[in-house]
């Protein structure tokens, strides 16, 4: 059968129209993502960002993570930060700007995924909802954390995965590219490995019946090849720099111990606390997502239910790996959550078919249900809070919002080659001052878990500190240092070392609004503490002459 001339002319018009809509949709997604994030670019670093920024800074001096500085995160995050720090911008703004680019790319990928089973309009809804919730301060979405950078290659792998499973024309190249994308995601955060394992398990259920076993095996092998190529390159790099053993221990061995440190009762407590916080902005989205998942079977068939439910379960495994359930861990749950919510919203929208419910009213209602609570949460951060106030609101009880000012003070009273020992977990101060840490442990969490080698590591750290002769000690112990079963040798040693060699320089005090100020000692005497203020558990000390 041949097509009529009118039919042949009509198809190119449809393709051009579809392309125009796609381009317009992607531009809209990018613009909205930028509009949501640009006002938040100046929020000061939190501690994870501080560690990445510090190591990214030291990369410019030929130093390496794992070999020169301890860190348990995979390597990609440090090179992304190094790229951001090379921009001619304020470092905090530059890092968050690069994060914004990744966030926009992730939202665009989610649109390409969603339109396959939701169509173009609801695909745009999915992407815009993702852009909104992913920047939610309650989920710590303003920070340039590993989940933010992991999301783009992970979602790109899903774009390729759906093309492979539904179209079946990818041959061997597409699975290899998918494996490379997964490898990049894992290089941002190890838990992305669960995403690839889910794809392997779900593949036979999502692909066609013809040659299912052969195609599933081929997909597994070729995607594994893609990951092996990428990670093989990483291993060769560290081997060439005599740092392979350090890389393996930090990124893998230590993390296997790390994820076993939290008992199940405490895991549950952490989970409940975080979910209670996230519910303030996401509760209605969760309910609509549950409706979407429940109605998927009857409307779309088995494959979509398997895909979305499996993706959600895999993401939850990643969230749960360490047991701490920090809010930013839940960012990896957002893609399947948003897709299910869009399905649920579309189902609710379809209930009002006919003239009884105006289209405009349905649109307003769906928008309010999905975006209302997140918008209420985000509003003061966009229009009222200063960057420091935003940091205090997002991370109550932490000094992140006031660390830039404290860092500026320490930069003035120290020399560029002076070293700082932080008895705590505030590596962002090292970055703000551009001063080297007195020990390779730029934050001390790896020394205070119930690890068999904790005492040996703490003793090694004391040797490094003595050799470095730090000009300044920042004493700001974290509550996690004192969890049951933690070795306290370094705590006792630090107190004795301070007593023998250091004088008080300043107190960090916190007022009732959570603002931290630096009170400098006068003539060796403690500064007066205003009534109602408290010493924030932080004392800065300088060496005795």
Spans of features found by a protein language model:
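Transmembrane-helix motifs of polytopic, lipid-linked glycan transferases
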Residues: 31, 97-117, 125, 132, ...
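Specific aromatic-rich, kink-prone transmembrane helix
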Residues: 149-168, 174-182, 337-340
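Short hydrophobic alpha-helices at membrane interfaces in multi-pass membrane enzymes
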Residues: 164-183, 212-222, 303-313
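Membrane-interface alpha helices of multi-pass inner-membrane proteins
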Residues: 173-190, 196-201, 229, 312-321
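Short periplasmic/luminal acceptor-recognition loop of GT-C membrane glycosyltransferases, typified by
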Residues: 178, 196-197, 387, 396-449, ...
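Hydrophobic/aromatic-rich transmembrane helices and adjacent perimembrane loops
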Residues: 194, 316-317, 322-360
């Amino acid at each position: 059968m041949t097509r009529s001339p009118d039919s042949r002319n009509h198809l190119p018009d449809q393709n051009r129209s579809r392309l125009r809509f796609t381009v317009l949709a992607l531009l809209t997604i990018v613009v909205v993502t930028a509009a949501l994030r640009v006002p938040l670019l100046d929020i000061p670093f939190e501690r994870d960002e501080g560690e990445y920024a510090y190591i990214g800074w030291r990369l410019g001096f030929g130093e390496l993570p794992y070999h020169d500085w301890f860190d348990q995160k995979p390597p990609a995050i440090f090179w992304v930060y190094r790229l951001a720090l090379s921009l001619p911008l304020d470092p905090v703004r530059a890092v968050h700007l690069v994060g914004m680019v990744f966030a926009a790319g992730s939202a665009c990928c989610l649109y390409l995924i969603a339109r396959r089973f939701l169509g173009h309009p609801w695909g745009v809804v999915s992407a815009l909802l993702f852009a909104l919730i992913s920047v939610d301060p309650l989920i710590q979405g303003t920070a340039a954390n590993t989940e933010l950078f992991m999301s783009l290659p992970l979602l790109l792998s899903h774009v390729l995965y759906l093309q492979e499973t539904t179209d079946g024309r990818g041959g061997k190249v597409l699975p290899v590219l998918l494996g490379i994308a997964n490898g990049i995601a894992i290089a941002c955060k190890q838990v992305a490995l669960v995403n690839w394992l889910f794809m392997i398990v779900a593949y036979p259920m999502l692909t066609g019946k013809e040659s299912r076993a052969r195609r599933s095996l081929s997909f597994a092998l070729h995607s594994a090849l893609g990951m092996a190529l990428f990670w093989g390159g990483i291993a060769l790099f560290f081997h060439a720099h005599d740092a392979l053993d350090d890389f393996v221990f930090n990124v893998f061995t230590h993390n296997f111990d790390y994820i076993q440190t939290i008992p199940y009762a405490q895991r549950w407590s952490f989970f409940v606390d975080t979910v209670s916080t996230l519910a303030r902005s996401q509760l209605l989205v969760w309910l609509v997502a549950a409706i979407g998942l429940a109605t998927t079977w009857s409307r779309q068939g088995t494959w979509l239910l398997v895909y979305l439910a499996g993706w959600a379960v895999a993401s939850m495994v990643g969230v749960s790996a360490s047991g701490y359930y920090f809010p930013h861990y839940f960012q990896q749950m957002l893609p399947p959550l948003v897709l299910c919510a869009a399905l649920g919203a579309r189902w609710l929208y379809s209930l009002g078919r006919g003239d009884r419910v105006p289209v405009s009213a349905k649109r307003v209602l769906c928008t309010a249900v999905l975006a209302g609570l997140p918008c209420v949460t985000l509003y003061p951060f966009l229009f009222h809070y200063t960057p420091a106030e935003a940091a205090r609101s997002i991370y109550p009880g932490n000094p992140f919002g006031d660390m830039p000012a404290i860092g500026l003070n320490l930069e003035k009273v120290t020399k560029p080659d002076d070293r700082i020992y932080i008895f705590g977990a505030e590596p962002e101060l090292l970055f703000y001052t551009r001063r080297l840490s007195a020990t390779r442990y730029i934050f001390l969490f790896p020394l205070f878990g119930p690890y068999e080698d904790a005492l040996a590591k703490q003793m090694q750290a004391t040797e490094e500190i003595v050799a470095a002769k730090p000009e300044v000690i920042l004493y700001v112990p974290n509550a996690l240092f004192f969890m049951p079963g933690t070795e306290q040798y370094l705590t006792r040693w630090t107190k004795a070392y301070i007593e023998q060699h250091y004088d008080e320089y300043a107190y960090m005090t916190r007022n009732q609004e959570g603002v931290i100020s630096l009170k400098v000692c006068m003539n060796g005497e403690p500064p007066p503490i205003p009534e109602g203020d408290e010493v924030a558990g932080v004392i800065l000390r300088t060496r005795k002459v």
